[in-house]
Amino acid sequence: MSLATSSSMAGGAAVVPRSATATTASAFVTMKRRATAVRAVHAAEPSKNPPVGVPSAAKTSSPSVAAPEKAPVAAAPAPVAPAPAATKQVAPARWAVDSWRTKKALQLPEYPNAAELEAVLKTIEAFPPIVFAGEARHLEERLADAAMGRAFLLQGGDCAESFKEFNGNNIRDTFRVLLQMSAVLTFGGQMPVIKVGRMAGQFAKPRSEAFEERDGVKLPSYRGDNINGDAFNEKSRIPDPQRMVRAYAQSAATLNLLRAFATGGYAAMQRVTQWNLDFTQHSEQGDRYRELAHRVDEALGFMSAAGLTVDHPLMTSTDFWTSHECLLLPYEQSLTRQDSTTGHFYDCSAHMLWVGERTRQLDGAHVEFLRGVANPLGIKVSDKMNPTELVKLIEILNPSNKPGRITIITRMGAENMRVKLPHLIRAVRHAGQIVTWITDPMHGNTIKAPCGLKTRPFDSIAEVRAFFDVHDQEGSHPGGVHLEMTGQNVTECIGGSRTVTFDDLGDRYHTHCDPRLNASQSLELSFIIAERLRRKRIRSSKLNNMLPLPPFGV
């Protein structure tokens, strides 16, 4: 369910890594965790509760485990028929909310005080869910549209949220840029845009190195504000479980504000001309956006004259969902609840979760956890991904081949995209699997500037163009874009129409992790994408023997 309709829901009682190599999940926490079924309580939606292609938990007095795939579940008796696939159906192993602890886990911290960690996790287990199952199901339905080319996913936000930069203005500005980008993409593509934020929970970050060394001093790497601090001292870098409680509180507060923005009038379409940020006003992108906003205003005037007034709910609110990387598994487990209407488990820390490039091992702890939760899932895929491995991973996470369940987030670099992506698309198509393909043009294009700071050239982010070219070639649907961006006027990525240079990086380089697009660069990229969507729409119209509307005045 979207934020726009969340008011109809009733809430339930609302380390220092030893090495950079894998640790076992069982070594991560030595104490036994309870696997009791905790139900998320909300308004029943029988019509919106189709069974999901993931294991459901058996309702017993013993620790909850998933029933075999063929066993019927009382709350969801009608199984979804899988699409034809080349792979043989194999009954999945039994799943429980803590079965990931039997698998090898990468990128997890080791907390020095096991008793304190246990107490914190029990506290979070008792907290209300941050999101609701019905909201996640509604997002899955929308993502299914994107898989079929009927919608476009815009997913964006901070590389890593921080405690220090947590304030309402930053949340509002990022939300506002996403609204602007959505308006541009909707106008260009003439299709709905699904808005999903990397917000309200995007704290933990995987690291390529377990330790960081400065001036001969070696300390554990910073892994995100919900794990340890970024200050380079021993006390700050020790993983602190209390940070998970603060991350929960910040996530809940962020989502509360986002709900207010989405449904309280701020996102009303008639405010389209007011969304421009001050520092983008006198720029090429600001001028282009004002021109587009004027055309939208004219369209709204026509719609009003036709009877669709500006106070209609479609015009005064918007749908907005949240997402983050599923990395810190103890936290994710503590916020997993059993949905009272379907019996399925949902990770109620976010509407959508994704598994990262470093943690997507077929037999790993993160994949084991995610296969049992019914949220829509993303899979980060680099040029290292083997087509056969991708097909197997999709089969594990979506054995019933449910549309909208799986989003493939490609991050390869422009040239690798043209070489590698076609083979992945063909393999998935041959297996009969339904996925939503989107591009992450950020992670495959990170470089180090002469000053030592990480940056990303805006021109290299033209990986987006390669993404569209490949899908045009393969006859598949380019379903969306995934961006690390901010509404702040930062100087972290070089290039763009306002020409941020290497020398400018130090002016406003505020990221706690990786460089982000600023508002002007984000808007510029949305115009590039909108033009590709427009061209695709025109080609599709011609193929269907439909002529596009003539220019105004003809």
Curated annotation (Swiss-Prot):
It catalyses: D-erythrose 4-phosphate + phosphoenolpyruvate + H2O = 7-phospho-2-dehydro-3-deoxy-D-arabino-heptonate + phosphate. Residues 1-39 form a transit peptide. This is Phospho-2-dehydro-3-deoxyheptonate aldolase 1, chloroplastic. Its main location: plastid. GO terms for molecular function: 3-deoxy-7-phosphoheptulonate synthase activity. It comes from the Eukaryota. It is found in: Plastid, Chloroplast. PANTHER family: PHOSPHO-2-DEHYDRO-3-DEOXYHEPTONATE ALDOLASE, PHOSPHO-2-DEHYDRO-3-DEOXYHEPTONATE ALDOLASE 1, 2. GO terms for cellular component: chloroplast. It comes from Oryza sativa subsp. japonica. Its EC number is 2.5.1.54. Pathway: Metabolic intermediate biosynthesis; chorismate biosynthesis; chorismate from D-erythrose 4-phosphate and phosphoenolpyruvate: step 1/7. Keywords: Amino-acid biosynthesis, Aromatic amino acid biosynthesis, Chloroplast, Plastid, Transferase, Transit peptide. One of its GO terms (biological process) is aromatic amino acid family biosynthetic process. Belongs to the class-II DAHP synthase family. Residues 41-70 are annotated as: Disordered.
